[in-house]
Amino acid sequence: MAKNVVIVESPAKAKTIEKFLGKDYKVVSSYGHIVDLPSNELGVDIHNGFKPNYLISNDKKNLIKELKSLTATAETVWLASDEDREGEAIAWHLAETLKLKNENTKRIVFNSITKSAIENAIKNPRTIDYNLVNAQQARRVLDRLVGYELSPVLWKKIKSGLSAGRVQSVAVRLIVEREREIQDFKTQSSYRITAEFTTSEGKVVKAALPKNFDTQAEAEAFLQQNIGAHFKVQSLETKPAKKMPAPPFTTSTLQQEAARKLHFSVSKTMTVAQRLYESGFITYMRTDSVNLSQEALSTAKNAIVQLFGEQYSQVRNFATKSKGAQEAHEAIRPTDMSRSSIPAETDQNKLYELIWKRTLASQMADAQIERTTVKIEADKHKEYFVANGEMVQFDGFLKVYLESTDDEEEEQEGMLPNLKKGEVLANRYITATERFTRPLPRYTEASLVKKLEELGIGRPSTYAPTISTIQNRGYVERSTLEGEVRPYHQLTLAGNVITPKTLSERVGADKGKLIPTDIGSVVNDFLVNHFDTIMDYNFTAKVENSFDEIAEGKENWTEMLSDFYKHFHPIVENVEKHTGRETGERILGTDPKTGRPLSVRLGRYGAMAQIGNPDDAEKPIYASLLAGMSIETITFEEALKLFELPRQLGIVEGKNVEVNVGRFGPYVRYGEAFISLDKGEDVFSVTLERAKQLIGEKKKADAPIATYQGVEVTKGVGRFGPFIKWNNTYINVPKKYNFDHLTQQDVQELIEDKLKKESEKVVKEWDEGTIRIEKARWGRFTLIKGKTKVELPKDTDVAAFTKEQALALLTEKTPKKTTARKKTTAKK
């Protein structure tokens, strides 16, 4: 019997905390939320104050029994879940579900898992903050209402399996709108003038004209003016400047900087940060505060003075700009500022070092800079060239850390040679280069987080799940675009001669940027057209502010939900009744062969092109869009070319060979075999020779690798990874095996292990196993015949269960076959 029971969310956190507390304390984990809304129904009583119907998760029932047993005999129960709204809700659910008594239940919070933080929390317990609980409930219930009512509308009007959400749908809207801005952007060209000069000592000075010329003719005329010109320094201005360090990390700035510097995804950053927090290396990682505690300020100063000297220290208190940051007590920082690295795996070390450097730099002196601007004049015209230079006089915080930017082409100013006013310079060359205006860049995961934060949409705990959700739903994907080659012109004046050149550059290429899919664009347009309030950026931000007000006790959560729902629900009902289906259809033109309309739209299996209409006497012809094509951007010519598929390539060993595109991408068909093309391979460029190569590789891959009990064993790679196939049974191959070189012993081991597991699952069988009862999860049993499965009631006596009972249940479960009624031909 434990005198004190401490309940935290994760086992890793429990393990770390248990090291700091004595033998009188037992630290256990709730493994996250122990209750949630049901997955198969709304779970909210709309007519009774929006009361949630919380259910204990099936996988937590045994855990609840254990926790009840532990807490029933404990003198004190300490609820030590995280210090945010989710953590407060977990503490409340534990108190309610375990029926804890107020007199011996204490709520403790800490923003770092260190001995001093834990001991301090034990000394300063509090009660559950119901304002925070209600703020979490309001978010959970409102998001359930939106998702549960909007998603079925999408199933009826667009496609089954779709979903909508208050934050996720707005995030998709941002990405769709940015993509359309890029597609609609009209590029304008101008000519940028750059030059290179030298001093009498041969030192190089690079300069540029402050303005661009609109046309090539204007640029060439300017170069003509410089033929035979003499150049000198017109003016030289030197000014002191300083650079200040960035504040310590919040959740969003950590996600952004980890993406730029470490190339981590947002979800990876949060996973790694969670491990660092649970191991006691950093403070809590879901925060929008830039504050540092007095203890942190003091330890940071000590570390800076010890490492770099007193002159590098400058204690700073940063102001938190983000709304709703009242719950977060501190920025993300190391728990021990004297530790620059940790005993952990590579990714954890990388992120820790980033946090350590950023925190340390935030408490360091400004960098002192000397900026020099030089104007260079010519004797043949009134324009002047400008050269900029920068010299670091005192590096300050730059000794440790420099924040990255999203601008990949930002120019860095270098040092200039010593120059004097009136000094004569020799010109090496002057170049007029055609440059083009660029649209705003596509969002990265990190820049999307930044935009959501700027708009007040979401909170630290929601950024990563939102970005994961919109990708998992197939509304957005991280894509690599090859772009296209664009020519540009350049004129160079050197030795009093102007030389023209035509060069080329690749534009529109993007890697790892967020791009909307066709389904994402169609869903977005439907929601914007019919649910403009939900999709409004200001409304979404206003809802977040309401949650903040609830957390502060300034707003009633059920009244807030009632006000929202009375406006929202009637719109849902109206859209269900009065709107048609949405496919994102675009009419591209007329098929020259048939005279029928050529269009593109969203179909059951994705984007497709279509010749003709369903109402025509002649059935429409369909073709799938290729990877990289989009309903919004495909041209008439590109769509028409799709109908050249399938392409007949010839005959190989008496079997027809063709190339085509299907649900899962482009493929070569060889008889009845389907062979996928390599990623990025052009379906229109595949030759018969290439097809033969693929067929040969397929035959080799499908050849038996072994036999077992006289039956051949083959191998392959499927959706769930590598497998072997024996006797129509698929068996996954774990990583511990060398899949490329499986031995007979490996194969035998894999098959026998599979057979053993299958036999252990079967508790009763009839007709040589064609009808059987198998063990299922949670102590239940499943009756199986072929593909038909029936879950037996929990109180079923399997030992006494008869074949007749089994057949009766299976007959009841098997759907009756119905004869399709012949359709009546429409009258013309």
Q: How would you name each of these model-derived features?
A:
Residues M1-R140, E149, P210, G309, ...:
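Intrinsically disordered, low-complexity regulatory segments
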Residues A2-N4, T16, Y25, T97, ...:
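Basic, low-complexity terminal or inter-domain segments flanking catalytic cores
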Residues P11, S29, P152, S169, ...:
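Accessory interaction regions appended to the cores of large information-processing enzymes
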Residues I113-F197, T238-K242:
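C-terminal or mid-to-C-terminal helical accessory/interaction module adjacent to the motor/catalytic core
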Residues D214-P248, Q255, K420-A426, T431-E434, ...:
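Metal- or metallocofactor-binding catalytic centers and their adjacent structured scaffolds
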Residues V233-L236, M244-A258, I282-T287, P439-K451, ...:
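Short acidic, hydrophobic short linear motifs in intrinsically disordered regions
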Residues Q255-E257, K261-T269:
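A conserved hydrophobic secondary-structure block that centers on an alpha-helix together
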